[in-house]
């Protein structure tokens, strides 16, 4: 039986208590190691970076990573403002044993570190986690082949690369592979799980639902025209993917028949105030069209980007909308609830002895969650090609300078 949509009034004290209890039930079992690999896109031939988190016995230390997965080489006090800090054992050996593999696919304009807190939670509970920065994804390129065909194939190539890795490959249980996808990453997960995408469905969606205007106007006119010209999208299903989690997913490229073909367990999250992928046309529709057993939660007051981990302080000036939530919504509190939920979902659905991969025999605990929005990485076209850390420092400098001028010289 499908778990019905849940409408929640934000994160109340009771919900917070439930989240603490739930997190306690899923206490970490391992320290977390990190390293980076590069994988070749089978469509464009480009190399793209993939962040790997995995269980280890090695002692962690503070690691400051930039958006490009490089180490921040500035003083720690500066790195904390402009880079992503995690407690990790860099390049350490994995622990003994067998692990599941989870690939996390970000939304358009996103990065491999968008869902780093979820990656840490999964890795500390015995999963290898791989999160790419999809080729051209950080540039909000949603044109034809690079997204509709490229993204799912990139995830399949990541699975290949991890299984072939001499250190991690022998530890992966091949029947315990899942995908988490946010926004266009949700499209990616659905396509890998057996829902055949169609550009005709996408075009029809935008013709029929003119009120989904922001989604249908997303990207450049050239990118939208490239999508119209792509023609039939091939079936990119990967039978190795045994369960998926969707967060504020893009459902427009799928008709109901395609969604009915998904034959793996699904847990989906919608955001009530998602103004990029309107919930009634995307997450709510998925909940009705996916096969029985789908677990669905609609989060009250959440926005499209509420699923993305919080950004370092100075980077919030750069990423803009992706760092903001609807008024009154607590992103960090929501993540304290959703991360253990997702760990629990994969624990239940990717059990090594689980013969049936469709739906869930037992409904997941109904705790709240959130969602996400996608926009340009910056507003200044001359700066959009620069490293996020440089843009953040410039933005921080400008903000402080204006504040000093206003305070000292009464300049507006």
Outline where the language-model segments fall.
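Acidic catalytic loop of the alpha/beta-hydrolase fold
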Residues: 252, 273-277, 305
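Alpha/beta-hydrolase fold nucleophile elbow
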Residues: 171-181
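Short glycine-enriched nucleophile-adjacent loop
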Residues: 163, 186-198
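Short substrate-entry loop that stabilizes the transition state in hydrolases
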Residues: 91-99, 108-139, 275-277
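Short beta-strand/loop motif that positions the catalytic acidic residue
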Residues: 268-270
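Domain-level recognition of soluble alpha/beta enzyme cores
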Residues: 27-102
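Short alpha-helix in the alpha/beta-hydrolase fold that links the catalytic acid
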Residues: 278-287
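Alpha/beta-hydrolase active-site loop
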Residues: 145-170, 207-213
